[in-house]
Amino acid sequence: MSDTNTRFLHQAIELACDNMAQGGRPFGAVVVRGGEVLATGVNEILATQDPTAHAEMSALRAASRRLGSPDLSGCSVYASGHPCPMCMAAMRLAGVGRVAYAYSNEEGAPFGLSTAAVYEDLAQPFAEQSMDIRHLPVPRPELYAQWAQAQNRKA
């Protein structure tokens, strides 16, 4: 592992430690581009009662605000723990090109800090997942077409 990776992973771990000391969950994340830290985040679920307030999500939001764009192409994310499926999806949608994490799901499992079961559930077809997921078509096909027209007017 390079010194750069080590430095940013240690920063994510320090954020997690500081967050834990303040009563939060032990997760921190750092968004980096070109060797520069764009943003950091910690898990704020307990403080905000927001189940999406994961460290990676907070860091992605802050980086996007700083750049004035949701496009985080060329960025790397360093996380203290194995990113959950929600965070992985957000990083992919934002264009993050690289993710490194310090602690695995296996290391977190004995402490209730693993999302391996969620990954396993999501790997199943919708009909076999633990959540009831249904496609319920509605008679309003114009919604997406209207959005596309609005985007074309902006261009």
For the regions a language model picked out, list residue spans one by one.
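Zinc-dependent deaminase
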Residues: M1-N19, P83, A90-A155
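Short, basic and Ser/Thr-rich N-terminal targeting/leader segments
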Residues: G23-F27, S73
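Residues that line or immediately flank small-molecule/substrate-binding pockets and catalytic motifs
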Residues: I45, A79, Y103
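Helix-adjacent hinge/juxtasegments
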Residues: M57-A90, A94
